[in-house]
Every structure is written in structure tokens, then in C-alpha cells.
């Protein structure tokens, strides 16, 4: 609850506005007032009200994560949603890619490609990381960010199963970081079934002035398993929505906050990218990636501010979609596939659709994918929760709304600090609006299939616990330090080795009632076997995932098959501030494994 | 329509930043667009102002030093918080940092420095800290620092060695065990647990070191 001072301030400000002639209804429409009568940016949502929190603890003199800054005012919904550029291949790369690292030509890779011959790249891309200028709002000055090909989020890859690609990643980031960020980088393809040396392993970062060739085979898990030889892997392991982001050990939060993030889509014969074929999912301009982020902007300079000395989690009070603060999105009255990614750094969200003129209305829609993996079939929902790095593909049918209607994409999950959400879901209209849909475009053809009538995407792979290696991971905090089984991230320590071709059952434990963690495990998708001893209660969790939400005092068991490639991978908390403060264990897939139960 | 002045709206907004702000009319949008003159602040100066108040501290050798001018500016540093009567974590971290110090060799006291700030300035006088340092065989380039209680507490908060749980934050035994490492002019700041392997702490420090060991900035 807001404290007395907050309430007094809210009342004072509200009276001032009402005295100025605004009705409560108008205030609400302006986003200035909640239905309960408090100002929208009350403590707990604005993350960081400097005036309230100053001196109450935390990096930089406060507890909210912004380091003593509350962003200057910005208007919402004055700029359109930015359509992300689609990345185009090049005819060839010079010098030509090599299996061994081309150190002489300036490649920062140190390990040979393990699957280059088996899956020779058919398309080539070159992408450059550099300092860029970007505007996030007409009410803030031009920002200096780091981006890919001059943009943040970077361009979207449109990749296809069965079409291996090679991405030459060029690092032109400056030595002068403008206050935060480390210009040695490692770009992780999040969710990718990628050989270790191309995965973006946190310790495989490379220097500015160099390049790094990432080989993405774009193969289904099980591709080397003879039982799936006919289909080049297990079709049930198909992925759709991936993203890429910097993963530099100790500096991931700074570098992602600075802009090093983008989307990567994978298509196949069912999820075709053409709404007249396959699963007939909305395609083309109706298939829209939305990358969410929250940031703080310095009230004096107007520039994005990163609290260097925060170790709990950083919450922003400005909400960005595809690099713009609170854009509007003009839509036609038809179905859209929206691909949602929570890029953090630390905030959990739960998105609802809200009609600001009718707060009691609820609007169901369909979630079709969890963490970028199509569900067994669409699930009708009224909200979607996303921890950091979780993704959800949803289908919203805007023909169900009135022509001209405006609908907010509203995060109603209350969160006051980096520890995680409070557990309260705020009433409609009291949360934070990330984006406004305006149903104003003319009617157009819709050849996509109504998700209510889709009965099947992919079955879930079987879970076989008969011969699993069992391991337990405790995610803890001791003396303010983040730990996995009492240990810390260390590039020189391999915590355990999984035998290639084996199955494992991992038990992830969060014994804390104070902290929540979105845990990400690289390389293989897992399935949740149990959440606190019972099958996962949410239909959307009966799915394939790569991030597990570890809520307070939870124990979650997850099942894996480890196949196809070998090498080093991490498991870590994806609250990137926790991650950068050592909440990560590095492990290996090898020809022989161990059975260490508490690595 | 509302008759709200820009001054009023900004005063209001300054007191409570607003998440979403929809305007009814285009003309209003233009009228309310900030005519703000954004300040240009050097990021290095901004970091100094935000995190490194230039308070006067006393070393274990009774030397008066200023936090920014004498300890942080132009240096590569390791920072932690401890207190001499701490029986659990501090002695282990101190021993670990002694290993780090040995690994750093002659760069210690030249361009790399370790600072241990006391959480217990009332008890941890320079003499007490001197005894503590001697007991742990601490070498040159590593200062144990004490000062006025309120300033030490401000430093702890500024440098982010706090817990959001007020009960834990009050409990010195559960104090934050991280070691912050950084290079002040390069604006590179990271952190690692005080009980990380000493070799890895040193490796982490090399990540923010001068390029090729030269104390100069790349263009």
C-alpha cells in the first residue's frame, strides 16, 4: 500500500488537477488517475520514486533500483509502434567462414565449429554492433545506445528449419561506454538448439575490432537420433520465437539495458509464415514481434540511466515496446499474431487487455506458444505472465472490438523492487500501460485460422523418467550474494557434465519467501514435470520451455533430453542483475557424464 | 476542455512521475511538449556525484584520505565492507583477498588498490583496523577505512551494500559479502562474491583493466 505521504501527495495533486477543471474520468483517460483515486505512478509501480525512497537503502542511495532517479514526464501513445527491420542475408562473406577460428583475420572465436560440415550454412549474414543514436520519446533527448545494425532492438532474423545459417557478428562498440556497458560481448541466441561455440556462452566474449562467426544449424532437437532420421529431428521439438541478446559474464544487465537485444524467428512446414498454409497463423504484417523493456531516464539529462551498484534488480518507470516508450499500434479488425518477449532487466509482467472506458470488461485472447514453442493447442487466456526472458505468442482478434476502439496492453502485476512481484494483481486501470491498440485501420482479408478451431499444433515429447540422472539446484541468497547450490559463477569451473544422449530430471528449489527467479537453462527445452509436487496448474505450462518461473518457496522438477551437440552451457537466473552477481552455474555436455546430484 | 497550464502540469508531474499520459488533442500535445533544456553531464562526473561522495576517511595508518580524490579517481579498485569483530564471513573474505593481493603482485599499490570499509566505525578505530590488517598479513595498496558513523552509513548505501529487507539490513552478521571491482576513468564497474575463487576475482579485474595493461584510453 502507498504510505501516508504518497496518499497525501496523490490527493494534493489530484485536487490541483480537479481544480484545473479535469474530471476524474478525464484524468483516468489521461492515465493520471487510477480507479481507486491514487495517481498511476504510485510507489510500487513507478518502481522508483526518488522523492519517496531517497535514503532508504539500495545502490545509489535508495531501494528501488533506479539509483536515485525518477524519469522525467513523458507522454504515452504519441508515437507508433516501430516495425522491426527484417535482417537480409549477403551473397558471401569476406574472408569466407572457416571451421577453425580465423584468428589471423581478427575472429574472436576460440573453438572450432563442431557441426559446420554436417550442417553447412546455406545463408550468410553479417551484423554489426556499434554505438547508435535512438529516440525513445519526443519528450526525451536523443539517446546513445548500443545496437545491432544501427538499431535497438536489432533486426529480426527470419530463419527456417533445414536451412543452416552463419552470422558474422562484428563488434565495433566503442571503448568509451558513456557511463555503463562493457564493449566485450557474447551474443546468445536464446532458445537456440545451437552448438556451444555459437551459443553465446557468457565466458566466450570477444573484443571490439574483432568478429565472431555464429553457426546456427536451425535443426530440430533429435536431429542426430536415428529414430527421427526420416524427419531430421523430432518435429515435436519445433521452436518459433527466439531472441538474441548479449550474455557477457558480469555485464549482461548493462549491455542488454544499453540495447543489445533483437528477435529471431524460426519457420517450418507448419509454422510457415504464410497464413494460407500450414497452421495458418496470422502472417506478414499481422505477425508482430513486441520486445518489452523498462528503463529509468535521468531527470536532468533525460538519458537512460543504469544503476551500476544495484545487486537486487533494476526496475524502470518507463515502459518501452520495440524501443519506444508507450507506442500506439493501429490495427485492422482481424486476427494478429503478437510475439511478446520480456527483455527485462528485472521486472515481471502480467499483461491484460484493458478498455480504459470500461474497466470491468474482460477480453479473452489465445496464447499459442510459451517461450517461443507452440503449445499442444491454443489456450484461451485473459492474461499472460512473463518473467524476464519469457516469451508468449498470442493471437488477438481485433474484429471483436468496436471500430475506433482503443485498448491498452496493461501490466497489472504489482512489483516494488527487484525481489519480484508482490503477488498482487492490481485492478484494471491501476497497472502500467505498455502499448495502446487503436482499431482504426480498414477491414482487410483474414486468411488465418480461428485459434478456437485449431485442435493441434505439436504433441509434447514423451517424458520418460525410467533412466534419468537426478540433480537438485538450490537458488539462494547468502550475505547478499546470489548462489546456485552455495556456489558462484566462475568461468574456470565446470560444475557438472551431462552425458550426451542422456535424460535428466532436475529439481529447482527456491527456498526463499522473499525472492523470485526466472531460471533459464541453455540448449535444450525442458518440460515441467511438477510444480510443488503437483502437475503444473496452468495449461500454458504443459509445454516446452527454456525459462522456469521460480516463485516464492517453490520446487519445480523439469525433464530434459540432451542430444546432438557438446560443449559448455550455463544455467542461470534471468533477472539479469542476479545473473551478473554470480547466480549462474556453468556445465558441459560431453561424451561421458557425471551423476553429481548437487553440483 | 480542461484548462490546465503547462506549469501546473509539470509541477504535478515532477512530484509524481506518470506512467501513461494520454492527451486528448493534437494542439495540447504540442503545447505540453517539454521546452526542457536537458543538462549535459559527463557520465564520469555523474557517476562520481551519484556514488562517490568525497568524504574524509581515515586509514589503518591514521592517514586522512578523501574517497573520490584519493581512493577512487584514476584507479582500478576492489571494494568491500567488513568489520573487525565479524566472526563468520569477513575473515574468510579477507583471507581470500589476501590471495588476490598476492596474485596481483607489484600492480598492487601502483594502479590497483583494495579498499575495505568498516561497518562498525565506532569500534573499528584505525588502531583496531591496523591490528586486523597485520593479523591477516595485508600488504601495501590495501586500505582499511573508517570514518564518521553517518558518513560510513551513507557510503554503504551509495555503494549498494544494502539489503532491501530492513531486518536483514540491520543485521551486521548478514551484511553484503560482495566485492565490487571497477576502473573509474573507464566507467567499468562489476561485482563478484567475496568468496569467489581468488583467481577468478583477479581475472574479473583484468576485464576492467587498462587495455593491454596501458593506463590510457582508447579513442
Q: Which positions does each model-derived feature cover?
A:
Chain B
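N-proximal helix/coil linker or "cap" segments that precede and/or mark the start of modular domains
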Residues: 23, 27-54
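Short, internal strand/loop/helix patches
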Residues: 130-176
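A short beta-strand-turn-helix
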Residues: 56-76
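Conserved helix-turn-beta segment immediately C-terminal to the redox Cys motif
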Residues: 94-114
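Thiol-/selenol-based redox modules, centered on thioredoxin-like
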Residues: 168-219
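Short active-site neighborhood of thiol/selenol oxidoreductases, capturing the structured segment around
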Residues: 69-89
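Thiol-based oxidoreductase modules, predominantly thioredoxin-like and allied folds used
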Residues: 111-124, 141-150
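N-terminal secretory signal peptides and thylakoid transit peptides that target proteins
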Residues: 1-17
